[in-house]
Each structure stands twice: as structure tokens, then as C-alpha cells.
Curated annotation (Swiss-Prot):
It is a peripheral membrane protein. It comes from the Bacteria. The active site is at 314 (proton donor). The lineage of its organism: Bacteria, Pseudomonadati, Pseudomonadota, Betaproteobacteria, Burkholderiales. HAMAP family: UbiD. This is 3-octaprenyl-4-hydroxybenzoate carboxy-lyase. Its cofactor is prenylated FMN; Mn(2+). Its EC number is 4.1.1.98. Its main location: membrane.
Amino acid sequence: MKYRDLRDFLQQLELRGELKRIATPVSTHLEMTEIADRVLRAQGPALLFEHAVHNGARAAMPVLANLFGTPRRVAWGMGADEVSALRDTGELLASLREPEAPRGLRDALGKVAMLKSALWDMAPKRVRGPACQEIVWEGADVDLARLPIQTCWPGDVAPLLTWGLVITRGPNARRQNLGIYRQQPIAPNKLIMRWLSHRGGALDFREHARAHPGTPFPVAVALGADPATILGAVTPVPDSLSEYQFAGLLRGSRTEVGQALGSDLSVPAWAEIVLEGHLLPANDPRAVAPVVPEGAPPPPDTGYEMALEGPYGDHTGYYNEQDWFPVFTVDRITMRRDPVYHSTYTGKPPDEPAVLGVALNEVFVPLLRRQLPEIVDFYLPPEGCSYRLAVVSIRKQYAGHAKRVMFGLWSVLRQFMYTKFIVVVDDDIDPRNWNEVVWAITTRMDPVRDTVLVERTPIDYLDFASPVSGLGGKMGMDATNKWPGETDREWGRPIAMDDAVKQRVDAMWGELGL
């Protein structure tokens, strides 16, 4: 599917029956979550709440939800016609991350053309007077309560900004980083920026604090960017390529960007809403001293304004514990005329992150095969909270091969740093079929011999099951057939009917009345 911006994408969804406009008044407080959750579980359409009720009154803009509620809509957002076509996207990313040696002159010319297209032809295009700056709120007009920010769950501490595309640049970086991080409003012009320590935005911020201590760190947050740009921020794009360039490759046209009004950051020109501002040093007059509740740990000494975030309902299906994160002070809000506010919720799978994980499986397979060619297929079950459990099938070649694959998966992509469980099966097992996977685990695996346990590894801080916040264990399960050296026993022979018998039964089947 080809499109220019979010509005164009929504128009095409509506023509395909994949967008439902809702004129009934619906509250941003809990009601939208319940409706979106029911529709997503039924694999229903994207939802545009045209009469959103926020803080007791009609909101000034509609709310878009469930945009990526099915794998097919994710594929359309990435410029593909079907989910299976995302394998081609993965092949492209694999080539950009680690190009193979050309097999001849024609192949070499093709690779040069592909790299030229990725690195030059799809470089972002800077435009003047971008649509995202048609309306500007500054000074006293900056009030986050004017945006219909959703309150997702009864135990949430506050509304939650969810689909914000956070734009940062480190002091030594040639390109900007784009990431999706949730944000908690704590004042009319302040949000808590909840990014995990290994994410690109957090890395850029730490580099800035080291290189320019005591100076504000510029940040922009785009809401309602085009789907290719949004999805580029959650895809393992190589460090040599910006998410804007990757979005251009997906879309088939260069990403148009405009310069933020208060910094040199480039923002999506067709985004619906953009928040501009800074992370402020703790001694800045605009910074607010942290409030430490009784019994809570003190904030880390970062030299910057910090606040205690949460609790919120998360993709695990539980409320997460509180933790300290930097505060984003919003200097201005820019937007298009008649903007659309893009929102989502996270909860017990399936939710939108889980659906994204299902679609991105197809992207991951070629990337993983480039490092581990023995991989046949790879699957992140949505009920595994997007990334916490992986099943991988391999062409086993030697004793201990499954264990090598486990450690390779934990290392090859940052996305799998927090994967707690990896199940390795042979290539006769479909990793996407739980009946087959469970059969392999229960027949080909000894719990003691074939289980790998690793202690004190990086883990998602939202994982309350880990003994220490941010550090926890990992388990690998070798559910492959065992080779000499792995067992001294005679291995089981699979049961199978003779082909001749099958053919005779096929011939008589129509006479059996079955």
C-alpha cells in the first residue's frame, strides 16, 4: 500500500473496510480502552472516535485507536500487501546491516544500486513550512490537558501518552534516533519520559549529559506520523541508516521533515501533532525538585530533572512498579489544522505491541539467518508479551548446536536482550504450532540435560518476576533430537504409515461415506 501521510493511510483503510468511524460520545477515561480491546481481540478495524469526551467535555480533536490491530494492517503500514511480504523487508534490512559479497558484476551493480537508494535516494527531504506547524501553541497556551490523552486502566496513576515518536540526537551522532516511549503527564507542560537504559533515546541523553553536563537536552515528540515512520521506530534498523531513510524505503518516497521551531531536530512534516522541548538540568529555574513518597527509593543523581513514573497497566497484563525517569518540559505544541490524536493501550496479550510482534516475526527471520544460517523459522508468540519467549527451528548439524543458537539469539539483536525463554526445535517442527512444540518438548527433552539456565542477565525492569530490578535469569530449552555425544541411549523412531497404505486408503476414501 502506498500513501503519503497518516490521513492518506486512513482514507485507504476506510475504502477497504478497515476503519470504523464512531460518532457516539466515548470517554478517553477507560471507555476507549474497553472498546479498542474488544475490537482488537475480534481482529476488527481501526477506530476513529469522532466525539471523544475528555475531562467531561467534547475533545477538540478525534482519537485514533487500534491502527495496528491486525498483522495485515502492520504490513500495509510497512508498504507491503501481505504479512508474508515482510520477509522481503527483512532481507533488505539484513543486506543493509551486513552486505554479502557480490556473486558477480551484475550482482555487485545491484547491491550498489540498493545501497545508493537506501543511503542517498531515500535521505529525508527538508521542507519549509511543514504541515505539522500550521498551528503553534506557546507560553501559557501549552497545556497537555488540551490533548485527549487516554487513561487506559482503573489503576493507572494518570493519563498516558502512548504512541509518541520520540526524536533525539546524541552529541556525536550523525543521524537522529526515533523511538516509541510512553510518557506520563505531571503538569500542563511536563511529561515523564519512560525510556529503558539501552534504548536509543536514553543513550543519546547520557552521551549529551557526559559531553555537555548541565545543559538542556533537546527532544521532540511526534504524534500521528505516517505509519512507515512510526513502524521504522520499532524495527531493528542498522545504525548506519536513519529511521527516516528506512521509512522512505518502505513508503517508496523520501520522508519529508521540517525543522523544529526550537531546536535543530527534524520532525515528520506531516505529523498531526509535535511536542517540542528539553530535558532540563536539575538546577534550571524551570525544573521542579523531585517528590519522594514515603518508602520510595531516592532518585538517581543524574544532574537532570527526574520524577517517579507509574504505576501503569502494561503489556504484561499487570501494573508495573514505579521508577525514576527524566522529565520532558514542553516548550511548544505544534499541529496540523484539524489534527487527529493517535493513541493505544497496552495490556494482557493480545494488544497492539503483541500484534506488531507477530508481523515483525517475518522481518526478524532473514536478519537472524544472516548471523545463524541454520535457522529455519522463528516465532515470538503474542501471549509471550511480545518478546519474552521465542521458539526457533533449526537444521541441526552437531551435538550442542541448539545451545549455540540460544546464546546467538540472546546476542545478535538488541530486541532479544530481554527474551527470557528460548525453545529450540528441529526443522520438522513448526515453531508457530503449539501442539507440535509441546510434543517436541515432552518427547525430545530431558529437563536436567537439555535446560540451560543463565543468572543475572539484563532483563526488562517491568519484569517483576525477576529477583532484582533490571537483572534476571534466562532459560534455554533444547527440544531437538539428540545426537551421539548428547545421549548414549537408542533414540526414538517416529511413527509413520506406509505410503502404499495411504494410497490404497486414498483410493477407497470416497466409498467409505466418511
